[in-house]
């Protein structure tokens, strides 16, 4: 499960990899969303969280030599889930193409089968936390973690760009373009 946080042209995400309902078997982390400040928005922050889940999962797969398995990604960003899992196109003019393409390519080359689950966000505003299912609780936790990490990093982390591991990227001076027409 991952959730993004965005404010003042800066984005972060909280993420957790957990083995079913077992909260003891989990990896939790937070990341700053890559990209130029002009490209930042809530959607990109959510994509940054999805990318973090994919990268950390890839590291675990490589370290443990995992040859097959299924991972279910939970996220409250329906448009991000749609762009990654349901669209059949992958065009550079698509907003945030750099992250979407990277995520899709990494998933396509993974030894794992990736599935998704839309998790309704901010469920704790209408339902007591202890009454939420596992997915709802994890989303609330990751929302909180993303906000805490935003507060810790927004004043000190400069914009940065992830290297494109599939294909090529387009730059103008020192800025990597997230999409182009």
Region spans (language model):
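RNase H-like nuclease fold core
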Residues: 1-48, 52-64, 85, 149
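Anionic group-transfer/hydrolysis microenvironments
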Residues: 3-5, 77-78, 145
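RNase H catalytic domain
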Residues: 9, 48-140, 162-165
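Compositionally biased, low-complexity linear motifs
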Residues: 17, 135-141, 154-160
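Glycine-rich loops and low-complexity Gly/Arg-rich segments
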Residues: 23-27, 97-100, 140-145
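Low-complexity, flexible helical/coil segments
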Residues: 34-37, 107-112, 151-157
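Charged boundary/loop elements
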Residues: 144, 148-181
């Amino acid at each position: 499960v991952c959730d993004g946080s965005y404010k003042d042209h800066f984005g972060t995400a909280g993420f957790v990899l957990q083995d079913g309902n077992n909260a003891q078997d989990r990896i939790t982390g937070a990341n700053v969303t890559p990209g130029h400040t002009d490209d930042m928005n809530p959607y990109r922050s959510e994509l940054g969280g999805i990318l973090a889940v994919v990268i950390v999962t890839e590291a675990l797969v490589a370290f443990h030599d995992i040859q097959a398995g299924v991972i279910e990604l939970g996220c409250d960003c329906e448009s991000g889930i749609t762009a990654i899992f349901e669209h059949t196109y992958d065009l550079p003019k698509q907003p945030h193409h750099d992250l979407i393409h990277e995520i899709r390519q990494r998933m396509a080359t993974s030894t794992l089968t990736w599935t998704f689950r839309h998790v309704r966000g901010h469920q704790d505003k209408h339902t007591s936390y202890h009454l939420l299912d596992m997915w709802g609780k994890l989303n609330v936790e990751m929302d909180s973690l993303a906000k805490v990490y935003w507060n810790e990093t927004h004043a000190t982390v400069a914009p940065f760009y992830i290297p494109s591991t599939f294909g090529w990227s387009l730059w103008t001076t020192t800025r990597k373009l997230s999409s182009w027409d």
